[in-house]
Amino acid sequence: AMLRDLDTGIEAARFQSPEHGALELPVKLRVFDSVFVPLAKWAMLMAGNYRCVQAEEMRPIKDAVHGDLDASQAVYDWVVGVCIDLGGDISDFVPFEKYAKAASSLANPSSAARALAGGAKNIERVDKLVSLVAAQQGKHLEVVDETVAVVEKWLTQNRAA
């Protein structure tokens, strides 16, 4: 109940600007009945964001997803399966088709890819987390393993620079 009250309060809060009047805050708190809803992002991150990272350069999210739609769906569905095996329900996850449609308008590489290209020595490693969680379930997917290896290669190079 307390989190739902916070959600409602944040949604209703406005900042009073002398120039623009009441402005909506750029902060949201979403409360879900399932603890697995936040894990729904894992499939999106793995199918698109981390697959922006290539051996020599970065590619836009739309190319990472739509360059090989079958591979993207395989990664997406595999990650959803990992989450379901943790206890999630299929209704917690966005259908791949809806994600792929949204990804078609993402013309830039992901923030993780841009950070690596910019020389970052550390980034958030959802790719590695998903891989390790899946390995505990006895699961591996070659495309995911390759993605983790490429991200690791960039980090190693950046740390050596």
Question: Predicted regions span which residues?
Answer:
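Flavin (primarily FAD) cofactor-binding/catalytic cores of flavoenzymes
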Residues: 1
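NAD(P)-dependent Rossmann-like dehydrogenase/reductase catalytic/cofactor-binding core
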Residues: 4-161
